[in-house]
Regions:
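Glycine-rich ThDP/TPP pyrophosphate-binding loop and its adjacent helix/strand module
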Residues: 1-30
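N-terminal cationic-hydrophobic initiation segments that often serve targeting/anchoring roles
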Residues: 19, 23, 96, 118-119
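Short glycine/serine/threonine-rich phosphate/pyrophosphate-binding segments
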Residues: 8-19, 41, 106-114
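Short beta-strand segments
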Residues: 7-10, 33-35, 128-132
Length: 154
């Protein structure tokens, strides 16, 4: 019944293991990985090329890599979507404010990535979006107005 699985990708274990299992149950399920700008994962998935020009500093923790982790099974992943540091942080704060979900930075990126992909979904699709971090680690960052303002995001 699950049509889409969406999760942030760092070292790749969650998306690769869960994606493999879901595709064994239903080969048509779509596995979507969320990546950060400054990471090599999306471009490598699309081209097979490790492009060092894709690498630059980013702030989001837990999503994106400047290496190709051995855990990432690129054949299992159907699509990567990149999310900016700013959009991930703002989405995490929005989920806390509107939904009462105190989630981590990477979860904000995952939610934002899903929003960016929403036009690809059909009304009867069943999307599983995995949030695998909590907000307590980000009280001094994403949930701190001064930190957000220092980056020009508030």
């Amino acid at each position: 019944r699950v049509t889409h699985f969406v999760v942030g990708v760092g070292t790749g274990g969650t998306i690769s293991g869960t994606g493999r299992y879901l595709k064994e149950q239903n080969p048509d399920v779509q596995i979507w990985g969320i990546d950060s700008y400054g990471s090599v994962l999306k471009k490598y998935h699309e081209t097979g090329e490790f492009d060092e020009n894709e690498i630059y500093p980013y702030i989001t923790e837990g999503v994106g890599e400047d290496i190709l982790p051995e855990n990432v099974n690129f054949d299992t992943i159907d699509h990567f979507e990149k999310v900016t540091d700013k959009d991930g942080a703002l989405a995490a704060r929005e989920l806390a404010r509107k939904e009462g979900l105190f989630l981590g930075y990477s979860c904000g990126s995952t939610f934002q990535g899903l929003r960016q992909l929403k036009d690809r979904l059909k009304p009867n699709d069943l999307v599983v979006c995995l949030f695998h971090d909590h907000g307590s680690r980000y009280v001094g960052k994403v949930y701190n107005d001064e930190w957000m303002a220092s980056h020009g995001w508030l």
